[in-house]
Amino acid sequence: MKTPAELKYSKDHEWARQEGDVVFIGITDYAQGELGEIVYVDVTTEGETLEADEVFGSIEAVKTVSDLMMPIAGEVLEVNPDLEEQPELVNSDPYGAGWIIKVKAANAADFDNLLSAAEYEKLIAQ
């Protein structure tokens, strides 16, 4: 299982990668492994401003549906268009091509309050 050190993580198993004032968000390798084969990603919050810990969409696997939670507050700028036709990218490349949304962060401090890779690894080891 991969947990890239350059990313930040939430207790809800989302990751965040900051690139300038845009933050890419997806689910962790651990989360995709627990969910199993992803068949659909449903995000209808594009253009909305959401608070941290608010639901921004859902992800559907063969046997379950799970809410997707905002790790930071901000405006949902874009949903990954590739997931419409290839939701399995979340399984095969969760930290790259399988990103789910781009967000304009409302507060830079939110990003700093997320878990480091080491802290996230401790969380999932429990």
From Swiss-Prot:
Its cofactor is (R)-lipoate. Residues 22-104 form the Lipoyl-binding domain. The modification N6-lipoyllysine is found at K63. Keywords: Lipoyl. One of its GO terms (biological process) is glycine decarboxylation via glycine cleavage system. Binds 1 lipoyl cofactor covalently. One of its GO terms (cellular component) is cytosol. It comes from the Bacteria. Belongs to the GcvH family. PANTHER family: GLYCINE CLEAVAGE SYSTEM H PROTEIN (PTHR11715), GLYCINE CLEAVAGE SYSTEM H PROTEIN-RELATED (PTHR11715:SF3). The glycine cleavage system catalyzes the degradation of glycine. The H protein shuttles the methylamine group of glycine from the P protein to the T protein. NCBIfam families: gcvH (TIGR00527), PRK01202.1 (NF002270). This is Glycine cleavage system H protein. It comes from Porphyromonas gingivalis (strain ATCC BAA-308 / W83).
